[in-house]
Amino acid sequence: MKKIGLLFLLIGTFFSCQKKEDSYLEDPYKGKLKVTYVEEAKGWVKNIALHNEDLYFIRQDPFIGKIDSKGNTSSVTVTKSDNFNFNNDGSSVALSDSGDVYYTKGLLGPHKIFKYTPSTQQTTEIEVNYTPSYFGGREGILALTRYNSNEFMFFDFYSKTIKRYFHNLGTIVDVMGSGRDEISDGTGINASFRGIFQMAVFGKDIYVIDGKNSIRKIEPEGTSFKVTTLLKNYPETINDLAIDDDGVIYVVAHNQGILKFNPTTNKLEDYLSGKYIELKTPKSGLGYIDVDFDVDVISIKGKDMYLAFSTTLIKIANFKEEIAKYLLERERK
């Protein structure tokens, strides 16, 4: 009788284990956030930019790297053009249609834009003329961002102005900014800024983080641009923002994961947060990656989301679908 009982116990255990294994084989990502890749940048990531299916990242040491759409990092070095450390707020990277890499060195960097041409492996410097503000001092060129195929936008911290760089023509012109160190709305030179560290473009509109805790919208108005403050004096540091194809604004703030901006209430709402997020990639086999989800940088292209925190780079393909699945499973636990 004891032998029969033991036999049923073993059979039950077998089918229980088999059921768990079958459940895993049916959906190996169950309860985990499915991501395309999790890659180490081997240095602190300060900013990212997308070109075609490739992710470019600017590191602090100095280094600009590239990861392809599948997470291959076998050839990541783009340039080590000088020994200047990028460990500054506002250091940025952007690309032209031809694949030329433009970058700036942030708040404490020189008053220049740098251009790296992969075909020649040469770096050239573009001088930005000084226009002292009322609070001139720090030189930095911040938040260089591709505006369209012909031009970039950036923030000149020294003059407290936003400028346009027409890279095909080699000309730089002022867009807006009074030069005063304050947050005030208006058009052209009637608007004022404290310090723009990140920009994101949606159509012809630009969304910026000003003073590290305010979100502002810049939109064309006639021959000039108008700025409107959407969110002011958020209690935590806002690290970055991105806009999806539907115009939804996603924000990453210190220790708060990913937030969404609600235009009806003008408030940030939780989207994906948590002290630890369990990530699973096609490479991770039976295991998963448990990460401290304090995001520094975010970018969106089409249905894909790209994140960076500390030295880690992440791509989430079909991010809305995958995050919705993950949140539903998390609620059921």
Map each language-model feature to its residues.
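Beta-strand-rich domains and repeat architectures in extracellular enzymes and scaffolds
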Residues: 38-62
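Bacterial Sec-dependent N-terminal signal peptides
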Residues: 1-42, 52
